């Protein structure tokens, strides 16, 4: 498969006791399919790194534990300032990045596989400027800056593209406060971080699942509007006679 689509030269590199082959190849991309099953909403977060509109929760507890432990270790190593401490610091940082990337790869693969199985597109939040918008306690701010929302979103998008699954981005505004059952929006709908209870209709759900359902609903509405506009701009075939 590599020889059929290989482009340019390949490099064999020995690093950290392992051999790595770096090769560039062209991969034919399928055309995005029409999401006949609607959209699969995905809410990205900190406590739970990804939650879907189907109710699947990908907890970030282990990843966050690793990051908090490494943050304490980095602080001690930085205070030492020795050459050996700096070497260990680089090693710890590299190990953490690889662990986070592996976690994001596994989560993104699960999400894309489920969307493909159910013939749905994938709906994500437009996370531009999230670091400026989100108000969090200091420990969460540290986690937010150290964990890359963009990386998981990128992994989902490119895996979906390779599978021919359309991905759409929606405005994330008030998705955490809006009821996915009746549409009522209020800050009081969130009695705590993990729970959503609508003060209007009484609908109760895991807060992240509720947000993911709102994301999916916005994607369905946006897709319908954009494709209706596309259909309206298509030229009408000329009639004969």
Regions from the PLM with identified roles:
Residues 142-143, 147-241:
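Positively charged, low-complexity nucleic-acid-binding target-recognition regions
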């Amino acid at each position: 498969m590599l020889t059929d689509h290989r482009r340019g030269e390949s490099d064999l590199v020995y690093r950290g006791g392992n051999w790595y082959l770096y090769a560039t190849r062209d991969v034919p991309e399928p055309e995005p399919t029409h999401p006949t099953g609607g959209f699969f909403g995905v809410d990205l977060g900190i406590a739970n790194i990804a939650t879907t509109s189907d109710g699947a929760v990908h907890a970030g507890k282990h990843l966050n534990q690793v990051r908090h432990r490494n943050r304490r270790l980095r602080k001690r190593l930085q205070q030492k300032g020795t050459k050996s401490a700096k070497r260990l610091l680089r090693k710890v940082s590299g190990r953490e990045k690889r662990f986070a990337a592996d976690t994001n790869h596994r989560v993104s693969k699960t999400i894309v596989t489920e969307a493909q199985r159910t013939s749905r597109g994938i709906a994500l939040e437009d996370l531009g400027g999230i670091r400026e918008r989100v108000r969090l306690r200091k420990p969460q701010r540290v986690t937010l800056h150290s964990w890359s929302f963009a990386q998981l979103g990128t992994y989902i998008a490119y895996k979906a593209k390779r599978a021919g699954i359309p991905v759409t981005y929606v405005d994330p505004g008030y998705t955490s406060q809006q009821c996915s059952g009746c549409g009522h929006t209020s800050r009081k709908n969130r009695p705590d971080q993990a729970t959503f209870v609508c003060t209007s209709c009484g609908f109760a759900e895991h807060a992240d699942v509720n947000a993911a359902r709102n994301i999916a609903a916005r994607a369905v509405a946006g897709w319908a509007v954009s494709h209706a506009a596309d259909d309206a701009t298509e030229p009408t075939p000329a009639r004969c006679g």
